[in-house]
Amino acid sequence: MGTPWRKRKGITQVGTMSPAIALAFLPLVVTLLVRYRHYFRLLVGTVLLRSLRDCLSGLRIEERAFSYVLTHALPGDPGHILTTLDHWSSHCEYLSHMGPVKGQILMRLVEEKAPACVLELGTYCGYSTLLIAQALPPGGRLLTVERDPRTAAVAEKLIRLAGFDEHMVELIVGSSEEVIPCLRTQYQLSRADLVLLIHRPRCYLRDLQLLEAHALLPAGATVLADHVLFPGAPRFLQYAKSCGRYRCRLYHTGLPDFPAIKDGIAQLTYAGPG
């Protein structure tokens, strides 16, 4: 009879100690939540709430955003469409888009460089595509690549709603890894004066090296890469700084609607194969 009693006693002691241990860790948990509250809000908004709304509505966030644009934006006015998307992201659901601060950097560079041909890798909902298209010089051409067909369908409708036709903005559905080797033969792109990398940062280095390997970057070409600090593209940045073929500049920004989360855009100027 004694042994079972001791076991029960041991279990009782462990049970009474667990809340005490949890209480001891409470200050640490609170400190971490306060320090990383912006990341926690981002996680809740982009993963938990978004997944719930996807299930309830049967639509993806990009499709819900486009429905909002249809009822609130002026067709044929890309600036008003962009402002409407910004309002949606700030007041309705967070949209993982470039946002107005980074957008101004992008538009200024497109206007300064006046590229004849721009290649965008990562169309997403079409936000940055509209930024580039409205800043292109007369006769300029934009090829934008999106790997997800459903997202690409939304972007296509947004681009056409803004008033840009297929001759000015061509959307290609496929992964950057598959599309880049085919650009010269299938899409008559012999050079990209400006390239925007705005999809998975872990793929940026691969994409850059593919562009080099297929001789699609002329000397003086500009390569812009978003999200190089968050979530980050350290291998891409290290390569660009150490290979000797690029001049690098980093624009420090925050995430749209989360300015406390630090991010940045890298601007590379290609010097040539060397």
Curated annotation (Swiss-Prot):
It catalyses: a catechol + S-adenosyl-L-methionine = a guaiacol + S-adenosyl-L-homocysteine + H(+). It comes from the Eukaryota. It holds the Pfam family Methyltransf_3. Keywords: Catecholamine metabolism, Cytoplasm, Deafness, Endoplasmic reticulum, Hearing, Membrane, Methyltransferase, Neurotransmitter degradation, S-adenosyl-L-methionine, Transferase, Transmembrane, Transmembrane helix. GO terms for molecular function: catechol O-methyltransferase activity. InterPro entries: SAM-dependent_MTases_sf, SAM_O-MeTrfase. This is Transmembrane O-methyltransferase. It comes from Propithecus coquereli. The lineage of its organism: Eukaryota, Metazoa, Chordata, Craniata, Vertebrata.
